[in-house]
Amino acid sequence: MLFVFILLLPSCLGYIGDFRCIQTVNYNGNNASAPSISTEAVDVSKGRGTYYVLDRVYLNATLLLTGYYPVDGSNYRNLALTGTNTLSLTWFKPPFLSEFNDGIFAKVQNLKTNTPTGATSYFPTIVIGSLFGNTSYTVVLEPYNNIIMASVCTYTICQLPYTPCKPNTNGNRVIGFWHTDVKPPICLLKRNFTFNVNAPWLYFHFYQQGGTFYAYYADKPSATTFLFSVYIGDILTQYFVLPFICTPTAGSTLAPLYWVTPLLKRQYLFNFNEKGVITSAVDCASSYISEIKCKTQSLLPSTGVYDLSGYTVQPVGVVYRRVPNLPDCKIEEWLTAKSVPSPLNWERRTFQNCNFNLSSLLRYVQAESLSCNNIDASKVYGMCFGSVSVDKFAIPRSRQIDLQIGNSGFLQTANYKIDTAATSCQLYYSLPKNNVTINNYNPSSWNRRYGFKVNDRCQIFANILLNGINSGTTCSTDLQLPNTEVATGVCVRYDLYGITGQGVFKEVKADYYNSWQALLYDVNGNLNGFRDLTTNKTYTIRSCYSGRVSAAYHKEAPEPALLYRNINCSYVFTNNISREENPLNYFDSYLGCVVNADNRTDEALPNCNLRMGAGLCVDYSKSRRARRSVSTGYRLTTFEPYMPMLVNDSVQSVGGLYEMQIPTNFTIGHHEEFIQIRAPKVTIDCAAFVCGDNAACRQQLVEYGSFCDNVNAILNEVNNLLDNMQLQVASALMQGVTISSRLPDGISGPIDDINFSPLLGCIGSTCAEDGNGPSAIRGRSAIEDLLFDKVKLSDVGFVEAYNNCTGGQEVRDLLCVQSFNGIKVLPPVLSESQISGYTAGATAAAMFPPWTAAAGVPFSLNVQYRINGLGVTMNVLSENQKMIASAFNNALGAIQEGFDATNSALGKIQSVVNANAEALNNLLNQLSNRFGAISASLQEILTRLDAVEAKAQIDRLINGRLTALNAYISKQLSDSTLIKFSAAQAIEKVNECVKSQTTRINFCGNGNHILSLVQNAPYGLCFIHFSYVPTSFKTANVSPGLCISGDRGLAPKAGYFVQDNGEWKFTGSNYYYPEPITDKNSVAMISCAVNYTKAPEVFLNNSIPNLPDFKEELDKWFKNQTSIAPDLSLDFEKLNVTFLDLTYEMNRIQDAIKKLNESYINLKEVGTYEMYVKWPWYVWLLIGLAGVAVCVLLFFICCCTGCGSCCFRKCGSCCDEYGGHQDSIVIHNISAHED
């Protein structure tokens, strides 16, 4: 019902009240001028307009508080109206009838000295409410003599109320001159407060928050104190200062003042003294200097450059668009039709591309109540929809409860179901029963039994479905305004067919709109453009500037100099970015618009306290401000702390020289990291876990209080913590992060399966193990493995020595004969070249005896030595086999003997164990007979024990299970804490590694961060980090600082000063790259002094406390204690305790172990040797033939070119000159010549 009255307010209030009271004055229709605006601005510096926070005291504190305060520097409006005996009808309408919104601050003049004798009211009455009728509450503060009568009641406010300073009812039954009530109204508060009647001004602070109304009061221009508060539950929407009717005393004038300014929710900086009194207040968003004060939380901020963040372009106009000349939907005609269906056969009608007035509709159908689902009812006014569908049917008054949202009554179960996910409003209204015909009754005549009529009216229900909010041309006209012109190039507030916001319009030519389309969106759902259906023009919409403003503030200046970064001044002042309408001076720089400073960038300063970046500096001089009235004292200059050519002149190191290794080369590293951010959620049925389905246990569990509730509460907290952390991680991932996946790389199979070891060679300590013998040990290359074949043979100690001797030269075969136990031996394996050589020698010896007999000697020796080598190897293997067989036989005998001894010992042990087991069984039987509480079954306990004992046993079981459950819950809490920390770490790594490139070493992977990717993983995130890791370093002499000319110091910025070829240069800490020292890589210091601080030495106390002896503690505990042992009367004589004697068996086992140890096989060393076999002779023959062919080819080329004949001629002349001409001598028979 409340929504209906609120929504009907704009159309039903012609004046403030609903009833015309008996008036003692006249009224007319003369127009009244608008409320005057004060020349005095709101000044909150001393606390005026603020209030003391309820129930809080602050001493000697400066802190930020958020509340409902006026805007510092704003103006007051005078809402006081005065007359003698005549009222104007225009006084009771806007703008005097004003919106209350968050609240108001009022500065009221006390007129006691100007009112006539006998006057009871010294200032006007104020009323604050919504409907000002007997169906809603109204707050009234009415003066009477020296008190303020405050009340919150359901008053019926008069249509033309006023405040007389000297009441005269003339005998009429008038309660006052502002309300009339036949019977006493319902009141939430009625109290009287005294005030200082001698104070010239009174100050009131009214605001509402969360349905509660607060009132504060002061009689001095300072912070107000608490007056009263009351919970109303309704939203107060309007207030009105009643006209003050009074005839002043002769010779004086009466001009009441009721200055009012609205309140907003704002942040203030307060300063409290030692008595808790507010001495200073600052509105943080009122000016640039105020934001600096709030940013530093100091009323006297220090000199520096501050980044201001609370500045957004203020709109300078309004663009309002609705489709013109749309017909009326006429929804009310269909709602008031004579034929109304029953719930079984409800009807629906859809309205589209038309206008409707919700206020008129509700008034027309005489609505009883209106409530909305998934939308605020007050927001429906003025909105547009794609379409509006209305379902209606008659309903008995007694069954209306079935249609409540979330109810599963009979009507929603069998007839009409309300969709709770849809945006809809539920309307109950009634029509005269004589004008309505109910049709389509249910066959069971259920509705006939309940009936639809109450007090001669038919009860009807309508469900209004609002489809496509702010996306169509079916609009409510309650708050509709006329269309305005589209202002381009400036920041404006817009309402385009129900879509509201602010932005900058720019006209463009676009052909991508269809005839039914008017709005353009981007991929994120933001409005990016629109087509004006009135003019058919198209526009793009860009957001208004919301950027960074740097304020250079000097503590001796009253205001700062400003730098609007990355925008020019024309945009700043065209779009009302600056709070200053007419700044003293401003200009454009390449950093942005500079305000309140002179342009002196052609000048350079060596020192600067206000650095703006990019080598620019703001300088302030108080004398310059006083001398030149057109200057604020600030100027923008160039900052040059030193000249580069002076760096190496008269330079001394500050703090000494140090050797440091700086990386010079890097390699890219890959690191994968998993971080858990979530875990499975757990819920426990505590009662079922502890008691199962046992009723007695569950009943006894109740006595344990809220333990089970606490368990579920803790688990819910754990689950909520997991949800919140997952939402935070998801939020971090959704803001500019794409979950990465491996891109196709054209390689079949995973990348990790590619083996790069053949390209990289042997790496690490496993080279010898993986190199297969001498190839790795002797450094055999991969080419040798490719060109030669390999063969393995047994080596008893001479093969490796032979190989070392030959060094790969096979002609040294017989020279490297080895001696083994006095016998000369050679390896039994021959290469192809060796076989060819020895075969050729043997063949020559056989073909030309006796002259070539000596050629067979190497072959014979080779064969004999190799047979010796083979025999020696076979002999060693045979001896080893004999040793193995003998040792194995000895081991089998020892093992058999050990098994015999073990079997004998186990037999004895078994007999003893069996005997003791029988004795223990007898003991348990006795215990079982004496005590019945053996089983843990609850049912058995209940059936076998009496009530007291059963309860004790159930308590024991419950305590045990609750202890286990408590331990589990504790573990869940600790695990959730770990997950919370790991999720926070994941968010940090998403922000610092994925979204940016961190400067932290080894935080995003190992080394300096390059790139990070994030992938989903079970219960967490998998980060893939790429970083570059140093591989080589440069040792350089570094200095923590330099001293120039003995009085000016320099410190490196993110690096070091190094000596490079006798000159000082700068290099980064991550990479050695000397570069000249400039202001970009260094920081200037005012002196060269170094302050040394020594950290205190702290040692942990490692002494052990002197604890008392356990015996002493037990003696203290047992002191004065008396214990009586129970008489169990057990038959202990039946327990036959047998002592084992296993000495002989253990000795036998020891002998067997000794024999096993003696069976160690000391085999003669037989190694495995790997040798390389070269290619066969025909391969080398082919290679030789190829070489001969190449030589012949070269000779042929020489002959063809003429080079060959020249060479032969020279050779021939040389021989002739040396020996002369001789006849050839031929010897025919060598043997005859010898004779």
Swiss-Prot record:
Any GO BP annotation: receptor-mediated virion attachment to host cell
Topological domains, Extracellular: 14-1176
Region annotated Fusion peptide 2, chain positions: 800-820
Positions of transmembrane segments: 1177-1197
Limits of the BetaCoV S1-NTD domain: 15-296
Signal peptide region: 1-13
Positions annotated as glycosylated: 31, 60, 134, 192, 357, 435, 536, 568, 576, 599, 648, 665, 804, 1091, 1101, 1120, 1136, 1157
Protein name: Spike glycoprotein
Lineage: Viruses, Riboviria, Orthornavirae, Pisuviricota, Pisoniviricetes
